[in-house]
């Protein structure tokens, strides 16, 4: 049975995954929410003002009182900066699975942070939430994200062809998943 425990702090070797705070607004603007390329790959709008980011933070922060809400600020321990986010944005209570989404600012990409955060959230899902399956998707054009997903040990499930229309062309959506038994066999 799925157990809802909400967004609790997770610590890894180089990161702290914690609830968003209003003081994260400047780092969010600096590192990712105003970056059109990142937001496009993430299928999110660009936020260009503190007021817009405050509205986004209002949505996140007001949801933390729900035990079935899972969204973390990804904070680099060394700098104390909020460098991205990760979430179980879709949680299916009936079928005991959840889907991860993540976003890391371009200054911090290709350093293993997305992999480190994703592995921690996978473990949280299986160990704390009692999930049966974790799934994750990426656009076919997002090669760095595909590498993160593969490094985390997900199994490729299939491609939804021409799923997104971006910049005048169609882009596919890759689906990956990990079952509890697969996670446990890697321990």
Please name every model-derived segment.
Residues 1-27, 31-39, 75-187:
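Acyl-donor (CoA/ACP) binding surface of acyl/acetyltransferases
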Residues 59-73:
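A short helix-loop-beta-strand connector motif used in the catalytic cores of GNAT acetyltransferases and
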Residues 38-59:
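Conserved GNAT-fold acetyl-CoA-binding loop/helix
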Residues 45-49, 70, 141:
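Short, conserved alpha-helical segments within structured domains
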Residues 32, 42, 64-65:
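Hydrophobic residues in alpha-helical segments
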């Amino acid at each position: 049975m799925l157990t809802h425990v909400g967004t609790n702090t997770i610590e890894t070797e180089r990161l702290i995954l914690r609830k968003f705070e209003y003081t994260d607004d400047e780092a969010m603007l600096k590192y990712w929410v105003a970056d059109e390329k990142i937001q496009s790959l993430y299928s999110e709008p660009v936020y260009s003002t503190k007021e817009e980011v405050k509205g986004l933070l209002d949505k996140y922060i007001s949801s933390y009182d729900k035990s079935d809400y899972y969204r973390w600020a990804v904070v680099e321990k060394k700098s104390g900066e909020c460098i991205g986010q990760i979430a179980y944005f879709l949680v299916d209570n009936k079928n005991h699975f959840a889907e991860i989404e993540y976003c890391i600012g371009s200054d911090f990409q290709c350093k293993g942070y997305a992999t480190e955060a994703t592995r921690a959230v996978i473990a949280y899902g299986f160990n704390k939430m009692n999930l049966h399956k974790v799934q994750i998707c990426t656009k076919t054009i997002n090669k760095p994200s595909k590498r993160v997903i593969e490094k985390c040990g997900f199994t490729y499930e299939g491609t939804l062809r021409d799923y997104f229309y971006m910049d005048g062309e169609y882009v596919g959506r890759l689906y990956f998943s990990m079952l509890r038994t697969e996670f446990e066999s890697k321990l």
